[in-house]
Amino acid sequence: MSAASAPAVDTARAWETVLQRIESDLIAGALTPGDHLPSERALAAELGVGRSSVREALRVLEVLGLIRTQTGSGPQSGAIIISRPSGGMTALVRLQVAAHGFAVRDVVKTRLVLESDVVTELARASGAAPTPALAPALEILDAMEQPGDELTRDEFLTLDQAFHLALAVASGNEVIAAMMAGLRESIEAYVRVGASVLPSWDDTSTRLKAEHRAIVAAIEAGDPELARTRIRDHIETYHAETNVSSIHPHREDT
Amino acid sequence: MSAASAPAVDTARAWETVLQRIESDLIAGALTPGDHLPSERALAAELGVGRSSVREALRVLEVLGLIRTQTGSGPQSGAIIISRPSGGMTALVRLQVAAHGFAVRDVVKTRLVLESDVVTELARASGAAPTPALAPALEILDAMEQPGDELTRDEFLTLDQAFHLALAVASGNEVIAAMMAGLRESIEAYVRVGASVLPSWDDTSTRLKAEHRAIVAAIEAGDPELARTRIRDHIETYHAETNVSSIHPHREDT
DNA sequence: GCTACCGTGTGGTCAGACCACATGGTCGGA
DNA sequence: TCCGACCATGTGGTCTGACCACACGGTAGC
């Protein structure tokens, strides 16, 4: 039913067995965030594989945002289980965009779909009771509006990204938050290029700030439909203005 | 302004330089799907790094669904650029679920959000003009209803997954399709466990088939709201019935 | 003409050797 | 007693070289 006989099973490549071992330890609860993995040399000896194979598996886990590695000795050294899905999501989406697997247009559209749901859920929750989870997002808005301290485009965009991410986090769905972060970061280069060619940045940033406040207002008013409409307009307007969707990772010339 | 002097810049780890090189080649169009990467040994020599570092980078690309490797010689050997985004999504989400980064509940919820948008878009498009893109999905439904040929639960679930994926593909947004596939696959183990404990599989499968037809009917009728409602009920009912969301990767006992 | 063979290049793996680094203990002096 | 310098230890990061299994493609022999 399961394995035919005794042999085989070993058909997987060495680094895959390492990955499987770690995954099963995670599922079994033998490994939880904060724990240290055994050292590469110990893992290699324990699993009967070479250290290079262990390293290939750890590299994958690192890129996927599951572990953090550090040299040296002490409590902070070695490979430690973390859980930072957004990092892996970013790398995944960005490379897929680069490889033509994803169109920038679809990335923007997907982000819109996810974020629409985020604000809808937040508005629903806020209609029932005040939402303290929104506090981080509000702080970011305050930071964006500091009088007398003009932000550069880059600084503004950084805060803008943080605001949208804060909304996603506030909704409580980590999967959506990670995906949104990944989608956004993966096209960040295009967004920044788009912002740099805008004729009047002052006008744009002023409008964006107003739209952010309006979105939050709709959420706090407990109006899902309004919040949804506003986030949609917010995203679509910006991307239409900067023409981000038409930017193509490929250079057709030369 | 940028680099202090001549040195440094090399601060990135060796395997990262390999990754960056490949990414930039992808963006520049020097590498497109179907192309062969240079051999590991050539890449190592060219970039001035060890072969093991090259391998770590290639391993990442493989897990992320960007390349396919094959031993031997000939046209099919070596590392070839592909673009299978769902593979990377699956690995990422599955491991994050295992590491407690993602809750199964949130995965299901996110899938629901994405799929709601898929059927909404399909219904809108279908309202304007017939949608030939739905053909693959319809074929799968036919296969699920073959009379006299009772499908096992596993076979049924495989077709079920294919149906939902076909809908996503029909919507034309590859990012959403890939993410949905990844989300679905990552919790497939839990879904199958849930199905295996259902009291009356015949009743369930009959109901699911009817629901599938109803969803398609709503799409073809060009009724976005109805399609949205039906897909939501379809997914929520099933997951409530099988209690998938409550399945926890951890075993609290022993 | 066909078959069997073998050279060649590929990824897959392992072993061993360094390196830089961060820690934590030890030893010496104040 | 206290404190600073020192160094042994263990970690990840990297490179080198060596095999292996495999798949192709040409070649020699039938």
What residues fall within each predicted segment?
Chain A
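Well-ordered alpha/beta subsegment
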Residues: 220-221
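Short linear motifs at protein or domain termini
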Residues: 1-113, 120, 124, 250-254
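Conserved amphipathic alpha-helical segments that form helical-bundle/coiled-coil interaction surfaces
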Residues: 107, 111-193, 212-214, 226-238
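Short helix-capping and inter-helix turn/linker motifs at the boundaries of alpha-helical repeat units
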Residues: 154, 205-206
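C-terminal effector-binding regulatory domain of bacterial HTH transcription factors
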Residues: 1-3, 224-254
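A short secondary-structure junction motif
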Residues: 25, 29, 88, 186-194, ...
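Extended hydrophobic/aromatic segments used for targeting, binding, or gating
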Residues: 194-205
